[in-house]
Amino acid sequence: MLNTDQLLVRAISERPRKSTEPLVPGTPTGLFSLLSNISPEEQGRLGSGDSLQSQSCQQQRSYSAGQTTKKERKPRRRNKKGRGSAEAEDLFSSPRKPSFPFQWAWESFIIDGQALLQSGSSVAVGHRSLLFPPAAPQCKTRHKSVANLSEDLRACHKSEVQNLGRRYQPGAWANLSLPLGKAESQGLERPTFWSTGKGSGSECEDVSEVEGQNADEAEKSLSTGELPQLPGQGLTLEEELISEVMEEEEHNRRKGSSVNKGRNSGEKGSEEGELQSHNQGSSSNSNSLRKSPKGTSGAKEFKGPWDLERLHRQLQEELESGPQKQTWKALRAAVQASARNRKTPVTGEEESFLTANFPNRTFHKRQEATRNLLQAWEQQQLKEKQQAEMRRAREQQVQQQVARCLAAYTPGGNRGTLGPQRKLEELRRKERQRFAEYQAELQGIQHRVQARPFLFQQAMQTNARLTANRRFSQVLSALGVDEEQLLAEAGNAEGIPRKHRSYRSFGVEMESSPQSPPKTEPTSSQPGRHPSPTLD
């Protein structure tokens, strides 16, 4: 959401104009020309703003008429602890009187005109300088009112006031105003940036009186020991100057005290970050001002005696070089003092670091107990070694005694030596005899195995014999020769019955007499007959 002055600048810059002089709101001609440039459609939408805009318009009209209530004088900034409502009301000035006749109409035009604007590029700084008149008289009166606070403050913070004076130029006004939604939701007063040419003297006098009263009230409120926060982004110039100067004074006063150093470390970091953002002049804008209060958490950096990392490095160096009792005591006292003064509690790592590295009474007792345990273990090991050596020496003595007893009870040397030799020779002779028998039996087995054919050889021989017998019987039957007659002539008829001859014709008989003549003799005995070609 854009700021109010940025919206105003865009509204005026987007409309075509011939000259910038009649647009100055201090003159009635400029106001009339701006109001006359609005189209009828826009005029119908001027009063159609939301509830927040109408409420802020009514507040501005009541401010311009001099009517103030307690609800309108709400504090424009929140206290960090939530209890600064009563003290913060005394720091703000009363509403100003109208600087020109139709100020309420001009302010209502500014508020209601937001609905007609569209987002666009930002306006150059030169247009802002034309729209905003010079604010030199106001700055002078404000510097005077700040100087009335105390001469010491003016001498100490001269450079800060000069930097703030440079920042409060017409070109930088656009960066100090809150967005309209935020300002109206917080109940803040809309700052009027317009000043008049002739009536500026009376206004400056009123402002100086109000600022003097506010300065006294600020000193009273700060004397109680409570430091108000920095003013918000939508405060007026004199209130920001007063609050910044008083906060700087309180910052220096707290910087000297050593008791509250640890408690206010986070607030100091936030104040230093905001003061540095205020001193940046033209580079400071609304985004940087919004981000400045958010950096309070990152500003808590422990320095001085509570820097545990530095202490840890020192302790490591002393441990390497050799511990000294005085340095241990000094470092332990420093860490204990910093732990008492520090706002944040000690974490688990820091506690373990303190308990592990500082040689206190418990550390010495634990070290002594460990040393005693090690000494007892060493003594036990020595005792065990001595007992083992004594046991080995005793065993050797017993073995020597047994050997001497055995030597004393042995018989004569001649008889004792001849008996075992004879037994040994007899055993060797029997062993040679058994080995010879075994070799002879093994050779007989080898001969029998070599003489007997293999199984496949026996099967081949049997098949060949059966094939020859079957062929012989077939040839005889084809020639018409009686096989039995042939067998009888051969002298083998008594040993072969008819049944066996029939089985032999089919190739079933497995045995044959070795004395039988060859089967081809009958065929050779009959030379006149020849076998038929079909059978061959």
UniProtKB/Swiss-Prot annotation:
InterPro entries: FAM161. Residues 48-64 have a biased composition (Low complexity). GO terms for cellular component: cytoskeleton; photoreceptor connecting cilium. It comes from the Eukaryota. GO terms for biological process: cilium organization. Disulfide bonds: none annotated. Residues 375-451 form a coiled coil. Residues 1-94, 185-234, 246-305, 491-536 are annotated as: Disordered. This is Testis-specific protein 10-interacting protein.
